[in-house]
């Protein structure tokens, strides 16, 4: 091979510098390499069930890193989003590239073959239980159901430390429950063990809890004193009220229902490479810091929540796949136990 001329050496060095520069972009060698190629694909379509403000914050942060990418998002409820995705699939015209939803609907999308496996290099920073073993989804943040209570009506000495404490006579008629809290119900039963869990739910129903629709509403009713406490609202529901001066606080009763929020790639994504790049961002430390800034609890192990000890000691309860396989049966069991018609 003939020796390289100075011009050829300079060209080689410039190529090397360019490659190194690409690799160093926000510390992400795989996602950053080839980003220019991916940016030429066009629009990225993101379907989300998070609220509009949170979804916009995430997509805006991504666009600041990749200004050539036009990200369009559509936000709706879990059930409406599922119907939309299924209708598109039946018509053979899927529009979306990436979806962010909750655990049960992520499971359904995978089961119906609508997701593509994508083992993002960022997934190594997520614990088992927070990512699909076959790489079809990874959870970006988790909402934990805790027991929130009114600090004016519940003295410190009476704050429950276990689920069983709520079976005491003093709590009869004083607890609010989400009227469609099916995943809380199934995950708690899974966490306790089926026999013990179902027995507990029947005993809890005998305490005459008040059923309401909406976790935010339940937290507000606790703050107003309509209930002394509620089992099914999330940490952020109570922290928002507490920070606004409401007389509420919360405690985690093990096991605590962990509501995952998986992000996944469409099996027939119009722009699969852009979709992968967006997922890489959402799972990256930078993306997870955006999640944290929205007062959510990131699932990435090196991105602690704010404050860092927020979920210290919480024992998460996930809904087992075999439970999802029989989810309709558990819905009927919930309705039977709590008298929902």
Positions of predicted regions on the chain:
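Immediate post-signal peptide segment of exported/extracytoplasmic ligand-binding proteins
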Residues: 34-45, 64, 168-172
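Extracytoplasmic ligand-binding site segments that recognize negatively charged/polar headgroups
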Residues: 45-57, 72-82, 94-226
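A bilobed periplasmic-binding-protein/Venus flytrap-type ligand-binding module shared by bacterial periplasmic
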Residues: 146-153, 189-191, 259-274, 290-291
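Periplasmic-binding protein-like
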Residues: 128, 143, 171-180, 202-205, 209-212, 281-304, ...
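A ligand-binding cleft/hinge motif common to bilobed small-molecule-binding domains
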Residues: 105-108, 228-247
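An extracytoplasmic/periplasmic, membrane-proximal ligand-sensing/linker region
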Residues: 197, 299-341
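Short beta-strand->loop
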Residues: 115-122, 136-138, 242-257, 266-268, ...
């Amino acid at each position: 091979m003939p020796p390289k001329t100075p011009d050829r050496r300079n060209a080689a060095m410039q190529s090397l510098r360019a490659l190194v520069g690409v690799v160093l972009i926000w510390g992400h060698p795989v996602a950053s390499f080839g980003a220019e190629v991916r940016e030429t694909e066009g629009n990225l379509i993101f379907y989300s069930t998070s609220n509009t403000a949170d979804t916009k914050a995430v997509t805006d942060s991504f666009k600041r890193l990749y200004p050539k990418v036009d990200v369009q998002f559509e936000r709706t409820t879990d059930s409406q989003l599922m119907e939309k995705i299924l209708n598109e699939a039946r018509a053979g015209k899927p529009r979306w590239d990436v979806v962010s939803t909750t655990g049960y609907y992520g499971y359904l999308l995978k089961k119906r073959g609508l997701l593509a496996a994508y083992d993002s290099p960022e997934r190594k920073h997520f614990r088992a239980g927070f990512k699909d073993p076959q790489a079809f989804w990874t959870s970006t943040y988790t909402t934990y159901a805790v027991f929130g209570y009114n600090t004016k009506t519940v003295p410190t000495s009476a704050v429950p430390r276990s689920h069983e404490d709520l079976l005491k006579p003093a709590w009869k008629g004083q607890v609010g429950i989400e009227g469609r809290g099916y995943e809380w119900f199934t995950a708690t039963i899974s966490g306790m063990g089926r026999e013990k869990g179902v027995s507990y739910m029947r005993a809890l129903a005998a305490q005459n809890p008040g059923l309401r629709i909406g976790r935010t509403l339940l937290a507000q009713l606790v703050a107003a004193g309509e209930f002394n406490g509620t089992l099914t609202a999330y940490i952020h529901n109570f922290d928002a009220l507490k920070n606004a001066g409401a007389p509420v606080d919360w405690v985690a009763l093990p096991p605590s229902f962990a509501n995952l929020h998986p992000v996944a790639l469409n099996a027939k994504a119009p722009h699969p490479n852009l979709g992968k790049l967006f997922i890489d961002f959402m799972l990256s430390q930078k993306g997870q810091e955006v999640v944290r800034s929205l007062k959510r609890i990131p699932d990435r192990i090196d991105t602690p929540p704010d404050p860092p000890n927020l979920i210290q000691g919480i024992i998460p309860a996930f809904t087992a796949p075999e439970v999802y396989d029989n989810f309709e049966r558990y819905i009927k069991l919930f309705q039977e136990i709590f008298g929902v018609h």
